[in-house]
């Protein structure tokens, strides 16, 4: 409660300082007939852009909304160049009205960028997860921040299940043997296990966490979850999962830990050396939430020592991950670029959801309540 009050106080303080030039509050208003400058930041697909007509989440195909926007007189700029003072995005910051980004190639929207963006009214995330935005600064400036809630929850939950099995069965070394022309069954089997009977805990049981638990139930695991809210009894029965209020009580019991919570100031670096030290030796960790929830070097040290038996995920800090990021080179990892939530099916959903919110914005209509991350100076509960 104290932290929530402090957050609100920060917002009010920043808002009141607008008179001194720090932030000018903006109204969520798109007058009918007004031409808007909309900027989208997506990953570039290059030769893959034309290989699938539904590949909408890339620069080249731009969520499939270019013709629609331009037919209404709006300007639509799309780029993948988002870092540094001379990047393409920076050129458009002063006069854009709407900025669209994705978690897979995020445009980091800092307080400094918000201050420069005098016309900015709306920040949209095509997907789920808006931690690339300084939400306190956005709230103080009176901006609206929204995302396409639910658009890729199935995609991410399925990917998490895949990663659990990949780690449990020691799949990656076997694949590497085949590619290298080798054959050494012992080199795989000595640390390959069944999923049945193992204890799996999810830290966070929102939409993705619940779907993962539902998909794990047929495997005959002991399922635990920690969240700020306990599920309804009927949902607990459906998932077969047991609520553990104390995270420190749950973690040492788990053979597999899955991270399913948002990145906030409270969760940033949460899995540090001290917390990792409390985990069961040989624990497997899957993190498709956000890379910054983990303390980078603490993960590397624990994997190299064997305290963490395997680590898999598709989220890094920063993104794209630099070539020298240590998670690329640590043993017993099954890392990929950030792809779990950008399947073709997910792209169709978040492209449609983005278009729907733009239509509502142009008409002056509210978004679906669950899509708001910042509205009227208030942050959504999961980010407080």
Curated annotation (Swiss-Prot):
Residues the record lists as binding NAD(+): 207-208, 227, 262-266, 288, 314, 338-341
Name of the featured protein: Formate dehydrogenase, chloroplastic/mitochondrial
Family in the record: Belongs to the D-isomer specific 2-hydroxyacid dehydrogenase family. FDH subfamily.
Organism: Arabidopsis thaliana (Mouse-ear cress)
GO BP, one annotated term: formate catabolic process
Membrane as UniProt keyword: no
Catalytic activity of the protein: formate + NAD(+) = CO2 + NADH
pH dependence comment: Optimum pH is 6-8.
Induction of expression: By one-carbon metabolites, such as methanol, formaldehyde, and formate (at protein level). Strongest induced by formaldehyde.
GO annotations of cellular component type: chloroplast; cytosol; mitochondrion; plastid; thylakoid
Listed EC numbers: 1.17.1.9
